[in-house]
């Protein structure tokens, strides 16, 4: 921001730009003015740098070391991709041949896939620098509680009712009032 203010000020205060826009002097005088301004510009950045330096932030080329920087996330990324690809096989298999094992596998896969997706959003959008130190921790704990409760509820439904795939099939089979009249 300070650089843009500096550049705007340089454009406004530049005598050559004023002369160029007004065209009140002949072209030969204009070129002399431009040359004089360019000679002064070589010395000017040193003086400006001393004034602007306290306002400018330090820029680092390397990434900052975070608390989790000691571990590699490659394994987690690989597992996330395997679970995502596995969903392509587990969901149809659970509907083709419904069983408690496939229902449980589908419940675990869907809940963990959703948990990782929402966790990525919490980490990205609930940064401590934006919302403070407490809210990211509360959001992450709430996400864990919701994920565990969802998985527990799905297991309860699988064990004590018709199962997940059959329950979804029954839900799809519900006909509305308009369908009965036709």
Curated annotation (Swiss-Prot):
GO terms for molecular function: heme binding; metal ion binding; protein-membrane adaptor activity; ubiquinone binding. It is a multi-pass membrane protein. It is found in: Mitochondrion inner membrane. InterPro entries: CybS (IPR007992), SQR/QFR_C/D (IPR034804). It holds the Pfam family CybS. GO terms for biological process: mitochondrial electron transport, succinate to ubiquinone; tricarboxylic acid cycle. A ubiquinone binds at residue 125. The chain crosses the membrane at residues 72-96, 102-122, 136-157. Belongs to the CybS family. This is Succinate dehydrogenase [ubiquinone] cytochrome b small subunit, mitochondrial. The lineage of its organism: Eukaryota, Metazoa, Ecdysozoa, Arthropoda, Hexapoda.
């Amino acid at each position: 921001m300070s650089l843009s203010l500096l550049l705007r000020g340089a454009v406004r205060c530049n005598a050559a730009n004023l002369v160029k826009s007004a065209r009140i002097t002949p072209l030969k005088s204009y070129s002399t003015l431009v040359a004089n301004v360019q000679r002064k510009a070589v010395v000017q950045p040193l003086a400006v740098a001393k004034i602007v330096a306290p306002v400018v932030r330090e820029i680092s080329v390397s990434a900052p070391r975070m608390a989790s920087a000691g571990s590699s996330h490659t394994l987690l990324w690989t597992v996330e991709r395997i679970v995502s690809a596995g969903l392509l096989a587990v969901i149809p298999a659970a509907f083709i041949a419904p069983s408690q094992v496939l229902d449980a596998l589908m419940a675990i896969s869907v809940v963990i896939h959703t948990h990782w997706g929402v966790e990525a959003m919490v980490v990205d959008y609930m940064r401590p620098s934006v919302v403070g130190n407490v809210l990211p921790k509360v959001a992450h704990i709430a996400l864990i509680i919701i994920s565990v409760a969802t998985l527990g509820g799905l297991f309860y439904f699988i064990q004590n009712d018709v199962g997940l795939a059959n329950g979804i099939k029954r839900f799809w089979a519900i006909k509305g009032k308009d369908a009965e009249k036709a």
